[in-house]
Amino acid sequence: MGSKDLFQRGSSLFPMGVNSPVRYFKDYPFYVDNASGSRIYDVDGNEYIDYCLAYGPSILGHADPDVVRAVRDQAEKGLIYGAPSEAEIRLGDIIRRSSKNIEMMRFTNSGTEATMHAIRLARAYTGRSIIVKMEGGFHGAHDYSLIRSGSGTLTFGSPSSPGVPEEVARTVVVGRYNDEANIRNIFSQYGSRIAAVITEPIMGNAGVITPEPGFLEFLRDITQKNGSLLIFDEVITGYRFAFSPYQDIIGIRPDLTTMGKIIGGGMPIGLFGGSADIMKKVSPSGDVYQSGTFSGNPVTMAAGFAALKKLQGMDYASLVRRTEKLMNGIDDILAKRKIRHVVNGYRSMFQFFFAESAKNYDEVMKADRDLYFRIFKRLMNHGVYVPPSQFETNFVSFAHSDDDISKTIEAFDLSVGEAAK
């Protein structure tokens, strides 16, 4: 059965035939049969070089044999116990040893859960209620994340999804990423009521937006001066650029960190952690409640440990070289055709925008979405899969070869030529 038929069947079961909106695109999404290494194969018999990589977890490539073996071995010993196991100790230990700032942690089942619990913990620890998030920053699908700015930079956010109560939105203030003056104004008005600022240190859910020099240091300074916590959402960036969270690369110590994706080796996972002083407020050692039937389940723990153990010896510089080659190739092709564009990226993640600039959410939202989608569809015709939306991120994995990069550049050149006609 092909993708079109499966989509018709799926549409009677799931809203628009999918279980996450990012997987849908017109006229219908492709349905995957299997994936291996840098390749993903659909049920229609097509093969693609994959740069979506499940939106970030698959840094080793699809179906890494060491991770698959670890999952199989653990599954034979039991899928879930409802009790602690050594598997969670092993994964927690390798994360703590490779992070300068995470003294204690708690595993969850998704990045959404991790940020939700981190926000609750920050409010409990500070005794304050207001959370500051960045416009366009994505921290999962819970109510406190699904907030966008109102008409003014100092107004409380309004819900960006029906079902989020206005009362919830009033506890979230939306700031502008890379805009120090805006954040200062927010603190001048609400400083004594702000529990925490939560931000992706590199925004990865509005395409890729990198921090301007000094911006993250500024956030650290202003939160400390006002008695607020700083939460880094490293669900995407944790272990993406080095064998550590991104915060260790730049030398900034947040109070709390959330992670996910890569640390699960492809299995569902989330984590929130930080100093022991803050984390000891989590139940049962403290009174901030958090739980989950599948939290710390042994199969996920085994997959995550196998992935991180393998990453520990990997050459991250090779990812940078291949990503830069691909970014430069894309930039050259678009410049040659005199197409207005920006290619944003950091080490092994990148995105291309058809805009004058892409330094913040407002600029990104002005990009030409139609041109991006036309190129996306043609790239698929030429055997390359990138995210259907330019507001997502491309990733390069250790499974991508130099030949993959060269083939992708060739496909991009053809696709741009076809889309620009």
Curated annotation (Swiss-Prot):
Cofactor(s) it depends on: pyridoxal 5'-phosphate
EC number(s) stated in the UniProt entry for this protein: 5.4.3.8
A Pfam family recorded for this sequence: Aminotran_3
A GO BP entry: protoporphyrinogen IX biosynthetic process
Keyword flag Plastid: no
GO MF terms held by the record: glutamate-1-semialdehyde 2,1-aminomutase activity; pyridoxal phosphate binding; transaminase activity
Modification N6-(pyridoxal phosphate)lysine, positions: K261
EC main group: isomerase
Record keywords, A-Z: Cytoplasm, Isomerase, Porphyrin biosynthesis, Pyridoxal phosphate
Protein name: Glutamate-1-semialdehyde 2,1-aminomutase
Organism: Thermoplasma acidophilum (strain ATCC 25905 / DSM 1728 / JCM 9062 / NBRC 15155 / AMRC-C165)
